Amino acid sequence: KAEPELFDKYPEIYKEVPAVVRTQRKPKRPLPKGANTICCTFKRFRAFYNWCIERGYTQNNPFANFKGIGTEKYGRPYYISVAEVEKIADFDLSANPALAVQRDIFVFQCLIGCRVSDLMRMTNDSVIDGAVEYIPDKTKGERPEVLRVPLNNRAKEILSRYADSKKGNKLLPFISPQKYNDAIKKIFTQCGITRIVTVLNPTTGNEEKRPINEIASSHLARRTFIGNIYKEVKDPNLVGALSGHKEGSKAFARYRDIDEEMKQD
């Protein structure tokens, strides 16, 4: 958290060891880091030292008596309802064809629940016997597992709509992840989905109330898939088989209390 102040106090270190090696730009003052970012960074360093110790590269373990790593803290996931997904899917965006394309991709992502990195790697070969099959990139190193997500009629309709208009073998006409996120915010605004949601500020850790259209992103599509499926089946093993969450995942556990109706059951 003190990195911005350290940058001001020791600028020569950042000049000697820049964050980006191949650049002629003057090092920028770092932004404050959130508690979750700091926690994850410490965990990676600890794993690296454990790896070195196991292989005999060093006996130095700076984490042996260090108790300050802590745990990540996340707010309750917010997502959009099935009705809101349908509203977005059916909204007239004919005045902005480029935005309409990204709307279709977002709706498709809501229907299969993958991460954006996996979505943009998909090709026509990813569709097998009426379902999307893929190995999540995030977990392929530790537990490679093929996920198979059946396609409903709307998802199949979206794929057929772009069957002859794509470049190469891409499943859909993707743009960069950042431009995709920007488009999603515009889509929510135009469709009138602007309700207030409660979120945790990742830097301060404080609770905030924000319009959902201002913070909507590709990951909201994944949360929407998980939240709506879990609301219907209430079986974490089935939902995990479709989303790729391993049994007992802390991230997946957060979805278990996100629906008011479920709390009344």
Put a short name on every predicted segment:
Residues 19-43, 54, 58-116, 120, ...:
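Basic, Lys/Arg- and aromatic-enriched nucleic-acid-binding interface segment
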Residues 88, 147-157, 161-162, 252-265:
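DNA/chromatin major-groove-contacting recognition/catalytic segments
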Residues 94-99, 165-170, 185-241, 245:
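Short, basic (Lys/Arg/His-rich) helix/loop patches that form interaction surfaces
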Residues 68, 112, 121-160:
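Conserved tyrosine-mediated DNA breakage-rejoining catalytic core shared by Y-recombinases
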Residues 1-22:
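A Lys/Arg-rich helix-loop hairpin that forms a DNA/phosphate-binding surface
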Residues 46-49, 53, 259-263:
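C-terminal flanking helix
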